Amino acid sequence: QLDFRLEGCNTLEERAQKMANILNLNINMFLTPEQIREKIDLRNEGNHFLRVVERDNGQKSILRLFNDNEKHPSETEISTALKRFVVQSPKVAFLTGHEMRDIYKTGDRDYNQFAENQYFRYSLGNQGFDVVTLSLEDQEVPEDIDIVVIADMKTPFDEIENDRLNKYIARGGNLFILGDARRQEIMNPITEQIGVTFMPGTLIEMKEND
């Protein structure tokens, strides 16, 4: 019976050597984390398995495995990866502050799953978008931003933030605005500038068995 207990192994190297001995493997078959990073640094990918598509000019695109039943990239994700070689990816900026929904948090009210999660097939990054966050308190909307997302803000913008947003709108920038119920007073000063108003109430779709 094999003993997989690692008592007395205090370092990663000691644990690796003991596991190799248990399984009768040559430890030299394996690369250390440092040696792997000399070839490719996967720390931003959680050290997960992935495929790298590379052109002759050195341009690279990534194909990931996903946390779903299909696992492998479909034609859609493969086409998206190849498209990055020839088309500039649209860049989406999620505004921060004012208690807006957060793309880095995984709670029910936040947007990590579809905005930032690398292993969710339908996240924006895996569907051909580049995603960043942006604070209007700190800076203007950069010229390379294609879409600005205002996600359910709970406190109003100040004068500087409003001015920076208005400049973006004036140059024809795209906006995606989301507001929860009972946020009219906060959201309407923004949307009314483009002829849209959040109305009181909740829209309900009734079904036959309800």
Please identify what each model-predicted range represents.
Residues 1-210:
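Short, surface-exposed patches at the edges or C-terminal ends of soluble domains, predominantly
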